[in-house]
Amino acid sequence: KGQIIKSKLNPERIYYNFDFATSHSTGFFLKRSIYKKIGLYNTKFKCSADYDLYYRMIKQKYFGAVTSKDELIGNVASGGFSSKFTFFQHLLEETKIRIHNRQNIILVSIIFFNAVIKKMFKNFLDIFKKV
């Protein structure tokens, strides 16, 4: 498998896409004072507690500092805890996070169905490439 390099921050993606988090908890640091304002990781979300924290952080306009693509902060092996969850389990939990954080349910539904359609299209293309 290839490597995934996460970089940059595009906080506007939060409004129209579930895949807005361009960070991994390995390379993510917050001051204690910010945790006191936005809260800690919500362990109610089994595979996406970091996603929930990022969502709350961005919604409250805490963007922090961003490194360049050349600066390696952490190296994460594949096969971690969240990789045991399916695409749809992740998607359902991300949907619950949005609703829990009071995002408009109509917009959340649109983003949800858009993610499903994109996944189906990607799967279709993958099958078509094999033929």
Where are these regions (language model features)?
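Membrane-proximal basic amphipathic "stem/tether" segments
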Residues: 92-95, 99-131
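Conserved nucleotide-sugar donor-binding catalytic segment
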Residues: 3-90
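Short, solvent-exposed polar/charged micro-motifs at secondary-structure junctions
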Residues: 1-3, 77, 116-122
